[in-house]
């Protein structure tokens, strides 16, 4: 007898009865003693067993006589009279249990085991063997119920199809979907590998405030909260940049932080209001040094985490083993809109005409640099499929970046693109306190004119710069988007364990 859970309308009809049955079983467990025991200890996991013994035949396993103790969730059960097969799922994967009535303590098989339900958490002890079909299994001599599940598994174990449920009840998604578990395991591996990469290069990991009196470090609308004890409004940080650069002023010459940022903006397949970034700052370096570091970082991560510098994403293959493409912003516009006369991009009137001709609504507050940037985003960004660095961003859209020595209208800045989306942003840092003060003033004027994403004037940060910031370069990398690429995920919600969702009514 193979157990299957009812589907569709039948499942809805039977759910209340099943919930009642499970609660009655729990009540019986309470009457008989400890309903949720915590004295069972496992000594291995399924993945370790498959790795160590998966290639051995049954004769070898019998000769070895390997006894193991495992624990996990019962995903399937096939009862065949006096014996049963169970699929047990743990953090490493799945292992099959062979459960025979005569091998367990008296009464366990009929009075306990057969009354358990799919989804229950079990502990098992026994010896390894191979079935006639060659499946590695555990011949159980002890079997215990560790946790009674009061609700049934979603759609047996073939997957949880409803997207809303996957995001709202991520625990069900992780139980039901192998790919989801794999995605978040890869995410963890990426973050660990990033930390190793940075520490090996002399960077120190630090933590900076998540709540700030003045939000800064990026152009975005912040979340506002109130600090009751201080009786002041505060902001969830939109970026850690200005605090990290204060640390460089203080003498920590190589720092990085991996943490969440918050931006009170729209939700899309690429945007979540709460997201994870790594930011780093390196003294006595410029943006060209960070281009080299970024290329090395991604090549190292793909090789160490995925085992290959080629990454499959949909129909595309991103090759991190080859030198990355490098284009200036205007070169990218010319490449993907060949009819563009580059001289027109230096003329406000002509640049506005180009922007409007491709459907961009030009705001009165925009200067030439903002217009050119909008043109780039419209005509070129989606075409930047292979790993690409775009350089020479206008100073107007780069209020914290150092001006170029030859052309002060542009900055020593780059953005890094893969698959038509921005993954990273880096630049030589502006360390001229007077220039920074003027740019903050320009941003404040833009905010007064209605730009709610313009930066606040941070007087304390200007004071820090007046004490002297060494020549420094900084880089920010969006980890969520990186994980999307590495796991072939097409929405950011698939790589964030608990994404922002509208509350259910």
Curated annotation (Swiss-Prot):
Protein name: Lysine--tRNA ligase
HAMAP family linked to this entry: Lys_tRNA_synth_class2
Cofactor: Mg(2+)
Highest taxon in the source lineage: Bacteria
EC number of this enzyme: 6.1.1.6
GO MF, one example: lysine-tRNA ligase activity
Species this protein is from: Serratia proteamaculans (strain 568)
Positions annotated to bind Mg(2+) 1: 415, 422
Enzyme class, UniProt record, top EC level: ligase
Catalyzed reactions per annotation: tRNA(Lys) + L-lysine + ATP = L-lysyl-tRNA(Lys) + AMP + diphosphate
């Amino acid at each position: 007898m193979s157990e299957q859970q009812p589907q569709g309308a039948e499942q809805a009809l039977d759910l209340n009865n099943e919930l009642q049955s499970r609660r009655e079983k729990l009540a019986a467990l309470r009457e008989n003693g400890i309903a949720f025991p915590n004295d069972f200890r496992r000594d291995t996991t399924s993945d370790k067993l498959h790795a160590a013994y998966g290639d051995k035949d049954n004769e070898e396993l019998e000769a070895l006589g390997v006894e193991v103790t495992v624990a996990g969730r019962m995903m399937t059960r096939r009862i065949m009279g006096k014996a049963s097969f169970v699929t047990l799922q743990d953090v490493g994967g799945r292992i099959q249990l062979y459960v025979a009535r005569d091998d367990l303590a008296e009464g366990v098989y009929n009075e306990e085991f057969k009354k358990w339900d799919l989804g229950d958490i079990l502990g098992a002890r026994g010896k390894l063997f191979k079935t006639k079909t060659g499946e590695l299994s555990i011949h159980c001599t002890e079997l215990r119920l560790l946790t009674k599940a009061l609700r049934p598994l979603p759609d047996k174990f073939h997957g949880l199809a409803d997207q809303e449920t996957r995001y709202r009840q991520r625990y069900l998604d992780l139980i039901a979907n192998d790919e989801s578990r794999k995605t978040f395991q890869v995410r963890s591996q990426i973050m660990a590998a990033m930390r190793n990469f940075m520490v090996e290069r002399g960077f120190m990991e630090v933590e900076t405030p998540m709540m700030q009196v003045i939000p800064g470090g990026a152009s975005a609308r912040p979340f506002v909260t109130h600090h009751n004890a201080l009786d002041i409004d505060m902001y969830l940080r939109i970026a850690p940049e200005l605090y990290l650069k204060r640390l460089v002023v203080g003498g920590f010459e190589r720092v990085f932080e991996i943490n969440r940022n918050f931006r009170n903006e729209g939700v899309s397949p690429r945007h979540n209001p709460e997201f994870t970034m790594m930011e780093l700052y390196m003294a006595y370096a410029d943006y060209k040094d960070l281009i080299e570091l970024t290329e090395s970082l991604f090549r190292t991560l793909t090789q160490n985490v995925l085992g290959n510098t080629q990454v499959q994403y949909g129909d595309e293959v991103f090759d991190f083993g080859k030198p990355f493409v490098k284009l200036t912003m205007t070169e990218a516009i010319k490449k993907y809109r060949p009819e563009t006369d580059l001289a027109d991009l230096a003329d406000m009137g002509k640049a506005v005409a180009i922007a409007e001709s491709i459907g961009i609504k030009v705001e009165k507050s925009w200067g030439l640099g903002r217009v050119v940037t909008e043109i780039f985003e419209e005509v070129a960004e989606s075409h930047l499929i292979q790993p690409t660095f775009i350089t020479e961003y206008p100073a107007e859209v780069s209020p914290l970046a150092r001006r170029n020595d030859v052309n002060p209208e542009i900055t020593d800045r780059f953005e890094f693109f893969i698959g038509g989306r921005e993954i990273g942003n880096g630049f030589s840092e502006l360390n001229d306190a007077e220039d920074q003060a003027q740019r903050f003033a320009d941003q404040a004027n833009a905010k007064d004119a209605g730009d709610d994403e313009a930066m606040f004037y941070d007087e304390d940060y200007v004071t820090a710069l007046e004490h002297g910031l060494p020549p420094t370069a900084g880089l920010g990398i969006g980890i969520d988007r990186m994980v999307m690429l590495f796991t072939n995920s097409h929405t950011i919600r698939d790589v964030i364990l608990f994404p922002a969702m509208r509350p259910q009514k």
